[in-house]
């Protein structure tokens, strides 16, 4: 199975345990009958100190599960969990500008775009693409 959560380098099983254990909250979208994982997210503080009330999350959805609204359900749950864990704002630092499906979802769910960071994301081929930070105030 291809990795769900892409990083510059792949995580090995022991490093995965440490990585996920270091999050404030991690969730998976799983078919309870088959055990197949369709997506996941991680939730953690975006910063420390006087900005520690702002959280950040990262999402991954299997390519063969796109269109099933898995991402939407993960983001909705993340909004609830962020508030339940005492955060006041959920901020996405690096939404790639060409990821229009994610951007439309975030905007539909009430996220506000903060601007554009030119060439903020390095693509696999070494080129750069703009990123769009977003935020959502939590209940």
Task: Give the residues covered by each predicted segment.
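Acetyl-CoA-dependent GNAT
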Residues: 4-64, 75-76, 81, 137-139
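Conserved residues at the C-terminal ends of beta-strands
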Residues: 44, 93, 117
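Conserved G/P- and acidic residue-centered "switch" motifs that form tight phosphate/ATP-binding loops
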Residues: 69
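Conserved beta-strand-loop-alpha-helix junction that forms the acyl-donor binding cleft
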Residues: 66, 92-102, 120-125
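Terminal substrate-recognition subdomain of acyl/acetyltransferases
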Residues: 117, 125-139
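Conserved active-site tyrosine of GNAT-family acetyltransferases
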Residues: 106, 111, 134
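A secondary-structure capping/hinge motif
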Residues: 113-115
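Conserved GNAT acetyl-CoA-binding A-motif
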Residues: 82-95
């Amino acid at each position: 199975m291809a990795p769900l959560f892409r990083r510059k380098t792949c995580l090995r099983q022991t490093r995965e345990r440490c990585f996920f254990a270091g999050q404030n909250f991690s969730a998976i979208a799983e078919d309870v009958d088959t055990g197949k994982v369709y997506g996941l997210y991680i939730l953690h503080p975006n910063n420390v100190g006087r900005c520690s009330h702002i959280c950040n999350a990262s999402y991954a959805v299997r390519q063969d599960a796109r269109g099933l609204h898995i991402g939407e359900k993960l983001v909705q749950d993340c909004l609830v969990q962020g508030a339940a864990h005492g955060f006041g704002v959920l901020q996405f630092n690096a939404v790639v500008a060409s990821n229009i499906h994610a951007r439309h979802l975030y905007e539909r769910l009430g996220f506000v775009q903060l601007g554009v960071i030119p060439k903020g994301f390095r693509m696999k081929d070494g080129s750069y693409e703009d990123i769009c930070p977003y935020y959502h105030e939590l209940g």
